[in-house]
Amino acid sequence: MALVVICGQPCSGKSTVALCLSVALKESESSSTIRIIDEASFHLDRNQSYANMTAEKNLRGVLRSEVDRSVSRDNIIIVDSLNSIKGYRYELWCLARAAGIRYCVLFCDAEETQCKKWNEQRREKCEATYDDTICLRSQIEEVAGILLCLNYVHVKMVF
């Protein structure tokens, strides 16, 4: 039915958006199966998964394979990961197109300082956080054709 790819800086609210979207879609009259695919789905540690380029490439391969297995006209798949590489988002678009389903990119637009603040708050609560090195080297390649841009400064998210 649809493939939703959420992208943004580390700790920019992607998982919160994915969860809110999933709940809102489940509460709608849609009979579709809603599924979130993320690192936690495979019991992978986000810091190990993004520690170096090889690990990140392997993670993208695992996520892509799971998306490929999951896309269908009866499912709504939400991909909750950094999804920072334009070529990777294009690969996911190709999977959606081949399956004959819709494709949407949600970009969580949060300031870098806000992301660091949220990451630190999570660290204080002993929740899963990103290493500072991952936050420093993370850059989102150009996001063109965005259907929805979530900016936490200007938009109050209501689902």
Predicted segments with their positions:
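Hydrophobic anchor at the beta1->P-loop junction of P-loop NTPases
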Residues: 6
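P-loop (Walker A) phosphate-binding loop of NTP-binding proteins
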Residues: 9
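Conserved phosphate-donor/acceptor-positioning beta-strand/loop module used by diverse small-molecule
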Residues: 80-81, 101-115
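Conserved GTP-binding G-domain of TRAFAC-class P-loop NTPases and closely related GTPase folds
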Residues: 112-159
